[in-house]
């Protein structure tokens, strides 16, 4: 028994129509239609080959159908990781090396490592035992089970065979059959099945009368606001506010006794840079007197009154020096003693010799 795949079936096709079409080349054991594709089981292999040769691209209800041998789902394989591969190694050489231990489904080299899909798990175990840590083209390669979860099934490794349709010469990602087994070019059937595409919205952006009316009203409102808030109106309002503020401030000032100053303040042509010196007041006179006293005291304390640097001349007594009319209260002896102290040389005096004399005064 040979299983055939029929793709791109029209919606009008029925199982009886497909069965009668394939019975022209041999006995049909089973016929199933699933949406726009189906499967036909023919008893004889030769009859299946004749049906493929004659019915492939056969036009049925105006649609070309595809007839080919059905490919079973890929069996679970064992994926091996091969590391430290020589840069001169090719896929064919690596495949031949692993085929010594069993059938190889796919061999893919990525830079200095590769992935090899073995058909049977026991063959993969034997390949690991025989090839791990062995020399291959001048480098010691490492073979172990792959732990990668990406693309665990074979396919898309090279163009030697597509795991979707089984044909050679194209990548699996370029296969016309999608992952569900359907032919990828089904645009017409898709439109017929799910309905035509909705016509685009043809009304232009400016066709809405409501939009135009609304925009015009907003434009008119903007123009009115702009005219009301012109520069001249704003300047006039500012000048009026300033005049009111100046009048209110002047009315709150106290009455000025000086008529000349009052007339100057109330005049309209005020000069902010016009400054006049104020007449001297009582406080200013007091300050001038204090300055004169300070100058007199400075000249008084600046005179030299040291007895050691006194100029030569007649020595005045205490009574004569004070001149306050108290000569009778001071004795002549005390005056003579004090004068004798001033006449002594500095180096002849002792520090504590005349303490009794100082205590008498």
From Swiss-Prot:
A zinc finger (CCHC-type) spans 160-177. Phosphorylated. Phosphorylated in vitro on Ser-306 by SRPK1. Phosphorylation on Ser-306 is induced upon cell stress signaling, which alters its subcellular localization and may modulate its activity on IRES-mediated mRNA translation. Phosphorylated. Phosphorylation on Ser-306 is induced upon cell muscle differentiation. This is RNA-binding protein 4. One of its GO terms (molecular function) is mRNA 3'-UTR binding. RNA-binding factor involved in multiple aspects of cellular processes like alternative splicing of pre-mRNA and translation regulation. Modulates alternative 5'-splice site and exon selection. Acts as a muscle cell differentiation-promoting factor. Activates exon skipping of the PTB pre-mRNA during muscle cell differentiation. Antagonizes the activity of the splicing factor PTBP1 to modulate muscle cell-specific exon selection of alpha tropomyosin. Binds to intronic pyrimidine-rich sequence of the TPM1 and MAPT pre-mRNAs. Keywords: Activator, Cytoplasm, Differentiation, Isopeptide bond, Metal-binding, mRNA processing, mRNA splicing, Nucleus, Phosphoprotein, Repeat, RNA-binding, RNA-mediated gene silencing, Ubl conjugation, Zinc, Zinc-finger. The modification Phosphoserine is found at residues 86, 306. Disulfide bonds: none annotated. Expressed in the suprachiasmatic nucleus (SCN). Expressed in myocytes; expression gradually increases during muscle cell differentiation (at protein level). Expressed in the suprachiasmatic nucleus (SCN). Residues 196-361 are annotated as: Interaction with TNPO3. It holds the Pfam family RRM_1. PANTHER family: HETEROGENEOUS NUCLEAR RIBONUCLEOPROTEIN M-RELATED, OS02G0815200 PROTEIN. Induction: Accumulates according to a circadian rhythm in the SCN. GO terms for cellular component: cytoplasm; cytoplasmic stress granule; cytosol; nuclear speck; nucleolus; nucleoplasm; nucleus; perinuclear region of cytoplasm. Interacts with TNPO3; the interaction mediates nuclear import of the protein and is disrupted by nuclear Ran bound to GTP. Interacts with EIF4G1 and WT1. Interacts with EIF4A1; the interaction is modulated under stress-induced conditions. Interacts with AGO1. Interacts with AGO2; the interaction occurs under both cell proliferation and differentiation conditions and in an RNA- and phosphorylation-independent manner. Interacts with DDX5; the interaction occurs in an RNA-independent manner. Residues 2-72, 78-148 form the RRM domain. SMART domains: RRM, ZnF_C2HC. There is a cross-link at residue 79 (Glycyl lysine isopeptide (Lys-Gly) (interchain with G-Cter in SUMO2)). It is found in: Nucleus; Nucleus, Nucleolus; Nucleus speckle; Cytoplasm. GO terms for biological process: cap-independent translational initiation; circadian regulation of gene expression; circadian regulation of translation; enteroendocrine cell differentiation; entrainment of circadian clock by photoperiod; glucose homeostasis; insulin secretion involved in cellular response to glucose stimulus; IRES-dependent translational initiation of linear mRNA. CDD domains: RRM1_RBM4, RRM2_RBM4.
């Amino acid at each position: 028994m040979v299983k055939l795949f029929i793709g791109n079936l029209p919606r009008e096709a029925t199982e009886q129509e497909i069965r009668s079409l394939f019975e022209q080349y041999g006995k049909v054991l089973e016929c199933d239609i699933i949406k726009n594709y189906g499967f036909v089981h023919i008893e004889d292999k030769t009859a299946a080959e004749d049906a493929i040769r004659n019915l492939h691209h056969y036009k049925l209800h105006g649609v070309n159908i595809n007839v080919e041998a059905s490919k079973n789902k890929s069996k679970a394989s064992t994926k091996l990781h091969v590391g430290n591969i020589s840069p001169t190694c090719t896929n064919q050489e690596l495949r031949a090396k692993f085929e010594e231990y069993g059938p190889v489904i796919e061999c893919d080299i990525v830079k200095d490592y590769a992935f090899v899909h073995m058909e049977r798990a026991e063959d993969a175990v034997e390949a690991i035992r025989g090839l791990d840590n062995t020399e291959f083209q001048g480098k010691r390669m490492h073979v172990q089970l792959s732990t990668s979860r990406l693309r665990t099934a074979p396919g898309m490794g090279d163009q030697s065979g597509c795991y979707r349709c089984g044909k050679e010469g194209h990548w699996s990602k370029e296969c016309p059959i999608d992952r569900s087994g359907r032919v990828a070019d089904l645009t017409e059937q898709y439109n017929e099945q799910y309905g035509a595409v909705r016509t685009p919205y043809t009304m232009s952006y400016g066709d809405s009368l409501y939009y135009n009316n609304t925009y015009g009203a907003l434009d008119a409102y903007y123009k009115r606001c702009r005219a009301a808030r012109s520069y001249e109106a704003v300047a006039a309002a500012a000048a009026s506010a300033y005049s009111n503020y100046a009048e209110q401030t002047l009315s709150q000032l106290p009455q000025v006794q000086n008529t000349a100053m009052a007339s100057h303040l109330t005049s309209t042509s005020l000069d902010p840079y016009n400054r006049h010196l104020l007449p001297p007041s009582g406080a200013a006179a007091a300050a001038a007197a204090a300055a004169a006293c300070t100058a007199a005291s400075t000249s008084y304390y600046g005179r030299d009154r040291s007895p050691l640097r006194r100029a030569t001349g007649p020595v005045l007594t205490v009574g004569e020096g004070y001149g306050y009319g108290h000569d009778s209260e001071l004795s002549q002896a005390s005056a003579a003693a004090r004068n004798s102290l001033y006449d002594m040389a500095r180096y002849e005096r002792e520090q504590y010799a005349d303490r009794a004399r100082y205590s008498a005064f």
